[in-house]
Swiss-Prot record:
The keyword Transport applies. One of its GO terms (molecular function) is oxidoreductase activity. PANTHER family: ADENYLYLSULFATE REDUCTASE, BETA SUBUNIT (PTHR43687), L-ASPARTATE SEMIALDEHYDE SULFURTRANSFERASE IRON-SULFUR SUBUNIT (PTHR43687:SF6). May form a complex with MA_1821. This is L-aspartate semialdehyde sulfurtransferase iron-sulfur subunit. Residues 72-101, 102-130 form the 4Fe-4S ferredoxin-type domain. InterPro entries: 4Fe4S_Fe-S-bd, 4Fe4S_Fe_S_CS, ACT-like_dom_sf, Fe-S_Ferredoxin, NIL_domain. Its cofactor is [4Fe-4S] cluster. Pathway: Amino-acid biosynthesis. One of its GO terms (biological process) is methionine biosynthetic process. Signal peptide: none annotated. [4Fe-4S] cluster 1 binds at C81, C84, C87, C121.
Length: 130
């Protein structure tokens, strides 16, 4: 099994090749799903095998990164949701779709907790981890 993790690289460490060094040192491959990195901060969402999490976390943290397990999927308030589809257009992982009756479907297992859908939802019907 694999798990999704969030890796945050603070400003003072952003110029260092933290991810590359960690992969070379540990031999553990990361499947990077989303990466937002600029000159001041870095944030990545990645998949790593459950059995290798502790080792990769230790190696990343020794380089100044902050690592967290993403285990709380998106929650949709069905009473607040008007099924407008705004979430479909911004989700990078295709968590949202319409079925054959045009009802909104949510595949929580695909969610990487990037928050794009939450920002886009005009009714505030989406939240993380509730």
């Amino acid at each position: 099994m694999s798990m999704k993790i969030k890796i945050c690289i603070p400003t003072e460490r952003i110029q260092n090749p933290i991810i590359s060094e960690t992969i070379v040192e540990t031999g553990i491959l990361l499947n990077i799903m989303v990466a937002n990195i600029d000159s001041t901060y870095g944030e990545l969402i990645a998949d790593v095998k459950d059995s290798r999490f502790a080792r990769i976390k230790k190696a990343l943290e020794s380089r100044g990164a902050i690592v967290a397990i993403l285990d709380r999927p998106i929650h949709r308030d069905e009473e607040e949701c008007v099924e407008c589809g705004a979430c479909i257009s911004v989700c990078p992982m295709n968590v949202y779709s319409f079925d054959e009756t045009w009802s909104l479907c949510v595949d929580e297992k695909k969610c990487i907790q990037c928050g794009m859908c939450i920002k886009m939802c005009p009714h505030g019907a989406l939240k993380l981890g509730e």
